[in-house]
From Swiss-Prot:
NCBIfam families: PRK01231.1, PRK02155.1. One of its GO terms (cellular component) is cytoplasm. InterPro entries: ATP-NAD_kinase_N, ATP-NAD_kinase_PpnK-typ_C, NAD/diacylglycerol_kinase_sf, NADK. It is found in: Cytoplasm. This is NAD kinase. Keywords: ATP-binding, Cytoplasm, Kinase, NAD, NADP, Nucleotide-binding, Transferase.
């Protein structure tokens, strides 16, 4: 049985041209279709929208049956991390560039959102990662990632020496520009550029993709999504760990980065006609003459 969607939350990217018109129009459309519409406080304040109730993100997730995110993939990454603990499903309207996560175009948003909220949808559960940095045995930083956790070099441009263990078992050491630890969702992001595999987003798996390793034998590996991945920085003159490219923490030699699956997945809702492979063909231009 499909879940009912009475209350719908709206979140819009603030600095996107045309976003105000899209947020207003979609809110009016949903209200006209009988839904209770709630806007994120910052979205409403930024655009000066006063004729709809507003909530902070925590309360928005708690009170909404679904949340529509208008923006690009970066906006969806940020909102997904914020709301993942609440279990509210997300619908993505693309007003960015790529649109792997926000797969519905503005031109089709009325029909697509109406279709989803009427119960005709494809639901995907996607895992997130939790990363912790330990220094001298004490936790000094932690964050979550929807796409990836990336250990990379900083401004000095020097290589990083890493030892990698999975579930307490040593796997290998590497000297490289860094390492991408990615969810299946993130395999079409930075990991793809680093030569990693494309993993179907509903799989419970994690890929480890070296960035410019100083060896000819290094290859990406895919492990269980329930694995505990431990990265030990044996030498790091200038290194950082990045979470979805939106949060970072400076690392030192001797630091340990522990990465596990986050406690709760995020659920994305797509129109009934959605196809992941069609998205790959469109976004990666498969089969087109270059």
């Amino acid at each position: 049985m499909q879940i009912p969607f009475h209350t719908v939350g709206l979140v819009g990217k603030y600095d996107n041209q045309g976003m105000e018109a899209s947020v207003r129009a979609l809110a009016e459309f949903l209200r006209g279709r009988g839904h209770a519409v709630v806007l994120a406080c910052q979205t409403a304040e930024h655009f000066g929208i006063t004729d709809f109730p507003t909530r902070n993100l925590h309360d928005l997730a708690t009170e909404s049956d679904a949340v529509v995110v208008l923006g690009g993939d970066g906006t969806m990454l940020s909102i997904a991390r914020e709301l993942s603990a609440h279990g509210v499903p997300l619908i993505g309207i693309n007003q960015g560039r790529l649109g792997f996560l926000t797969d519905i175009t503005v031109d089709h948003m009325y029909d697509a959102v109406d279709e989803i909220l009427s119960g005709q949808y494809v639901a995907e559960e996607r895992i997130l990662l939790k990363g912790q940095i330990l220094r001298g045995g004490e936790r000094v930083f932690e964050a979550t990632a929807f796409n990836d956790v990336v250990v990379g070099k900083g401004g000095s441009g020097r290589l990083i020496d890493l030892e990698i263990a999975i579930d307490g078992e040593f796997v290998y050491s590497q000297r490289a520009d860094g390492l991408v630890v990615t969810t299946p969702t993130g395999t079409t992001a930075y990991a793809l550029s680093a030569g990693g595999p494309i993993v179907h987003p509903t799989l419970e798996a994690v890929a480890l993709v070296p960035i410019c390793p100083h060896t000819l034998s290094a290859r990406p590996i895919v492990v269980s999504g329930r694995s505990r991945i431990e990265l030990h920085l044996t030498y790091a003159d200038d290194a950082r760990v990045h979470f979805d490219g939106q949060h970072h923490f400076d690392l030192q030699s001797g630091d340990h980065v522990w990465i596990t699956r986050a406690n709760r997945p995020i659920t994305l809702l797509h129109p009934h006609s959605y196809s992941y492979y069609d998205t790959l063909r469109q976004k990666l231009h498969w089969g087109k003459k270059l």
